[in-house]
Amino acid sequence: MTKDLNTLVSELPEIYQTIFGHPEWDGDAARDCNQRLDLITEQYDNLSRALGRPLNVLDLGCAQGFFSLSLASKGATIVGIDFQQENINVCRALAEENPDFAAEFRVGRIEEVIAALEEGEFDLAIGLSVFHHIVHLHGIDEVKRLLSRLADVTQAVILELAVKEEPFYWGVSQPDDPRELIEQCAFYRLIGEFDTHLSPVPRPMYLVSNHRVLINDFNQPFQHWQNQPYAGAGLAHKRSRRYFFGEDYVCKFFYYDMPHGILTAEESQRNKYELHNEIKFLTQPPAGFDAPAVLAHGENAQSGWLVMEKLPGRLLSDMLAAGEEIDREKILGSLLRSLAALEKQGFWHDDVRPWNVMVDARQHARLIDFGSIVTTPQDCSWPTNLVQSFFVFVNELFAENKSWNGFWRSAPVHPFNLPQPWSNWLYAVWQEPVERWNFVLLLALFEKKAKLPSAEQQRGATEQWIIAQETVLLELQSRVRNESAGSEALRGQIHTLEQQMAQLQSAQDAFVEKAQQQVEVSHELTWLGENMEQLAALLQTAQAHAQADVQPELPPETAELLQRLEAANREIHHLSNENQQLRQEIEKIHRSRSWRMTKGYRYLGLQIHLLRQYGFVQRCKHFIKRVLRFVFSFMRKHPQVKHTAVNGLHKLGLYQPAYRLYRRMNPLPHSQYQADAQILSQTELQVMHPELLPPEVYEIYLKLTKNK
């Protein structure tokens, strides 16, 4: 290093971070990094302990290398990336001061570095307060893609994200919620919020991974994950719950609020209540109830989580959907024994459904979704009576070929469609007074169902009416639900198109307004050009007064002209600023998803319009010209191909016609000054460039404007 550290630090655009190992600069650092370092070190230690070795770390936007070198001091192998050479110079000087550190620093762009990463090259990536600049340059979708790839090729990513509310030029480009940048990743968790030196708005820090569940007291890889509790759940819980499945664990991760505010207060409270309820039940299960062990649990302001022992087997709903053979006797028997045992201790499961039952290889059934275990005997949906709801569950076990899709349940309540002895069993319960209905009674009658009288022989007119009515109601529910789903999808598409049209109309209105303003300025400039000779004469008069050593008093016409000239200059400056802002708005529109989605539609409409305007022959000529331009451009970039083509044309005697065609399409350029001189009149040039005025007039002009 040819320069000492003092010189390198003095050359920094900003001392943004604490200078590692040099407390003399602590007071000059824009941000105190120690609080964030504690949190980053904690996550580093957790992952290092889980992997059983020091980590390979990539620090994107490393600035002065404080975090990189701090982790290197713990044994990490570090690569730091920053686009400013001055930052990298300081990092390298600090690395030279610590030769035992495995730290390398490079100048580079984050987009290019992420694109070139190989899977497993780094264990941990850090990106602190840097990706908002990339959002501003390339848009939200591109940053989402970059972060997805970063999470794919590493075990964990730590991100500090700027927010839209910060009062800076890049704020308008940011998403409404920073989680929009990472919600496509499998696992993300808020681990802290930190103030900055720029504004009082705190920035959140997230831990992200596509491979691991990353909780302070639990750090393990998962085999797969899903944001539905079971197959076919649709938009249950609005995708606010994520489920991670490891080799021997299951992790439930519930979000209490979501980007775009899609969760209502009731839905958020439901997530929180069910998770708390499940944690409470599993940490203190009733005596004799076979509950999975709790491995970890916790929460923060945005989310809560529970990691538990993985039960063997498969979901009953998956087995039914796959048409697998099941032993209904064993499944119902084991399930009833669990429900009766819970009931005796004052607990009930309010959501006994095929997707909340796990069946092992011995066809033994176990309840899951322990957040649905309550102390009030009432189902979470229709029918609210728990025994009636269990009737529906039993019907679902035997209704493999039904296509009903009801609002609440897709099987009937009555037991009369069941085969014997199952219908005899439930009909015996049906005949009991409702106040005696419970799972103990269901279990007692289940165990002697083979000896119960036939339900068919006892069926009367009331039972027949119930069968007919329930069948019709389920069919009608299915049709209404299917039509409602189709209508909802169409409404969503219409709403999206209306939003896109509104955006395009707004942009068009802005263009028209700016164009009108520019036309008004153009008229003003034209008037000034037409009266330039009069202005020159008045300036000569003013010069004569100045030579007489008399302070000239400008005639009213001159004062008015100068005022209008000054106003025109201000207007031009104002319009230039607005034009720049308009260009930025246009860029945002061009980067938007709606613009890309309507690209094909716009191109097709343009081609139809041009075909109508110019006709088929002219459009064909235009197409041929475009092809020829492409060919000429290709040959200019590839001299060897051009040389071969020219030789071939000479041999065929076609060189001169081809050259004339080339010159016709690519005329020799004229100088910019000549082109401007052909377009602008002398008077217009003098308005735009006062130095072109006659020397005497220009001298007066300078005297009149020197105090402005």
Swiss-Prot record:
Residue segments, region Kinase: 211-459
Enzyme Commission numbers on file: 2.1.1.294, 2.7.1.181
Name of one Pfam family that matches: Pkinase
Reaction catalyzed: 3-O-phospho-alpha-D-Man-(1->2)-alpha-D-Man-(1->2)-[alpha-D-Man-(1->3)-alpha-D-Man-(1->3)-alpha-D-Man-(1->2)-alpha-D-Man-(1->2)](n)-alpha-D-Man-(1->3)-alpha-D-Man-(1->3)-alpha-D-Man-(1->3)-alpha-D-GlcNAc-di-trans,octa-cis-undecaprenyl diphosphate + S-adenosyl-L-methionine = 3-O-methylphospho-alpha-D-Man-(1->2)-alpha-D-Man-(1->2)-[alpha-D-Man-(1->3)-alpha-D-Man-(1->3)-alpha-D-Man-(1->2)-alpha-D-Man-(1->2)](n)-alpha-D-Man-(1->3)-alpha-D-Man-(1->3)-alpha-D-Man-(1->3)-alpha-D-GlcNAc-di-trans,octa-cis-undecaprenyl diphosphate + S-adenosyl-L-homocysteine; alpha-D-Man-(1->2)-alpha-D-Man-(1->2)-[alpha-D-Man-(1->3)-alpha-D-Man-(1->3)-alpha-D-Man-(1->2)-alpha-D-Man-(1->2)](n)-alpha-D-Man-(1->3)-alpha-D-Man-(1->3)-alpha-D-Man-(1->3)-alpha-D-GlcNAc-di-trans,octa-cis-undecaprenyl diphosphate + ATP = 3-O-phospho-alpha-D-Man-(1->2)-alpha-D-Man-(1->2)-[alpha-D-Man-(1->3)-alpha-D-Man-(1->3)-alpha-D-Man-(1->2)-alpha-D-Man-(1->2)](n)-alpha-D-Man-(1->3)-alpha-D-Man-(1->3)-alpha-D-Man-(1->3)-alpha-D-GlcNAc-di-trans,octa-cis-undecaprenyl diphosphate + ADP + H(+)
Main location: membrane
Impact noted for substituting H197E: 90% decrease in methyltransferase activity
Family named by the database record: Belongs to the WbdD family.
GO biological process, one term: O antigen biosynthetic process
Organismal lineage: Bacteria, Pseudomonadati, Pseudomonadota, Gammaproteobacteria, Enterobacterales
Region (Required for membrane-binding): 601-669
Coiled coil: 485-594
Pathway: Bacterial outer membrane biogenesis; LPS O-antigen biosynthesis
Entry note about domains: The N-terminal part contains the methyltransferase and kinase domains that are essential for chain termination and polymer export. The C-terminal region is required for targeting both WbdD and WbdA to the inner membrane.
Positions contributing to S-adenosyl-L-methionine binding: 16-17, 36, 61, 82-87, 108-111, 128
Effect recorded for W355H: 50% decrease in kinase activity
Positions contributing to ATP binding: P229, H237, R241, R242, Y243, K252, E274, E309, K310, L311, M358, D369
Ranges where the record places region Methyltransferase: 1-210
Membrane topology, record value: Peripheral membrane protein
Keyword Nucleotide-binding belongs to the record: yes
Protein name from the UniProt record: O-antigen chain terminator bifunctional methyltransferase/kinase WbdD
Gene Ontology molecular function: any one: protein kinase activity
UniProtKB keywords: ATP-binding, Cell inner membrane, Cell membrane, Coiled coil, Kinase, Lipopolysaccharide biosynthesis, Membrane, Methyltransferase, Nucleotide-binding, S-adenosyl-L-methionine, Transferase
SUPFAM superfamilies: Protein kinase-like (PK-like), S-adenosyl-L-methionine-dependent methyltransferases
Gene: wbdD
Effect of D350A: 10% decrease in kinase activity
Subcellular location, record wording: Cell inner membrane
Source species of the chain: Escherichia coli
